[in-house]
Amino acid sequence: MKRLQAFKFQLRPGGQQECEMRRFAGACRFVFNRALARQNENHEAGNKYIPYGKMASWLVEWKNATETQWLKDSPSQPLQQSLKDLERAYKNFFRKRAAFPRFKKRGQNDAFRYPQGVKLDQENSRIFLPKLGWMRYRNSRQVTGVVKNVTVSQSCGKWYISIQTESEVSTPVHPSASMVGLDAGVAKLATLSDGTVFEPVNSFQKNQKKLARLQRQLSRKVKFSNNWQKQKRKIQRLHSCIANIRRDYLHKVTTAVSKNHAMIVIEDLKVSNMSKSAAGTVSQPGRNVRAKSGLNRSILDQGWYEMRRQLAYKQLWRGGQVLAVPPAYTSQRCAYCGHTAKENRLSQSKFRCQVCGYTANADVNGARNILAAGHAVLACGEMVQSGRPLKQEPTEMIQATA
């Protein structure tokens, strides 16, 4: 089987190279935005979507135009890749996978991609990029496989390179034969049906006061001044640090779970729906807005979607599988007798069945219900719906996160 893998390193460009990279990223952003604007005009005129083949001719037209001849100074392939990114964004929108494409803003996700023409010298920790030349990078691990494309990106004032490779590997067979249910939560990041518990790292919560202080300082500075730019970079670095802490911890958790279990059953949680604002409208204001806002922050701080993504590809690489089941009533159902009632969940950590008297940790009970749902799905050979797809947190948890 063929495996696609990405290796990300920090670049060490020279002063002139850094200026060129900023210019290339700006050119790619310009091409993307201008093509999107033309697509919008075409749509308003009542015409159909214009595919990539036609958009590529626009690029030739813009390069020959007097006011945009500066596009010739940028490599052609990254500009073409920007148009392909726009085409992919439209396809995702048509398939209802993403929202309608939006214009790119300067300083946010500045990047450009080379599909070919790249040379990698791992022994000397350097890479050759068209129109940029040889550039050093922080070589932290060996790149394996055939290089398919290279993406250069900027984050918090630093430049990074992502090298995507393709390699041929034998079909993996997972060393374990066990199956486990995983219950994701706020008080506990993940609880397994065998009783294993992974505590949350809460990287945002731990840095929330520092972030608020930096944002207050930013509000007192003149917008777009040098001091304002410096303060904004401090906030960006803190956000990056928070995300890195969360991602690193999730990698450790998902690796530990993936190594020990061939089949992992999780809840099919809709995080975007669960973390929607409760503010409501002027005519119909929401209730418990502050408490819901605190719960939303706690949910997003855990990184449930990222944990699911990591589990999926790690299981694929190890020969295992991830199975998503409907999350309805897993926190209210007794894992022993199957009785489902809201009163069974006494608190965040306590579960006691009102019928059979079964007592257990609430998260462990939920994980066992998830495992049982996974067994039912495998037995039936199809997804089993068991009510509305909603995972409820107890009232005391909502209050505690406010």
Curated annotation (Swiss-Prot):
InterPro entries: Cas12f1-like_TNB (IPR010095), RNA-guided_DNA_endo/Transpos (IPR051399), Transposase (IPR001959), Transposase_put_HTH (IPR021027)
Entry keyword set: DNA recombination, DNA-binding, Endonuclease, Hydrolase, Metal-binding, Nuclease, Transposable element, Transposition, Zinc
The protein's Enzyme Commission number: 3.1.21.-
Residue numbers binding Zn(2+): 334, 337, 353, 356
Molecular-function annotations in GO: DNA binding; endonuclease activity; metal ion binding
Active site: residue positions: 183, 267, 363
GO biological process: DNA recombination; transposition
Top-rank EC class of the record's enzyme: hydrolase
NCBIfam families: guided_TnpB (NF040570), IS200/IS605 family accessory protein TnpB-like domain (TIGR01766)
Entry's family note: In the N-terminal section; belongs to the transposase 2 family. In the C-terminal section; belongs to the transposase 35 family.
Task performed by this protein: An RNA-guided dsDNA endonuclease. When guided by an RNA derived from the right-end element of its insertion sequence element (IS), cleaves DNA downstream of the transposon-associated motif (TAM). Cleaves supercoiled and linear DNA in a staggered manner 15-21 bases from the TAM yielding 5'-overhangs. Binds reRNA, an approximately 150 nucleotide base sRNA derived from the 3' end of its own gene, the right end (RE) of the insertion sequence (IS) plus sequence downstream of the IS. Not required for transposition of the insertion element. The corresponding transposase in strains MG1655 and W3110 is a truncated pseudogene (yncK).
Protein name: Putative RNA-guided DNA endonuclease InsQ
Species of the source: Escherichia coli (strain K12)
Lineage: Bacteria, Pseudomonadati, Pseudomonadota, Gammaproteobacteria, Enterobacterales
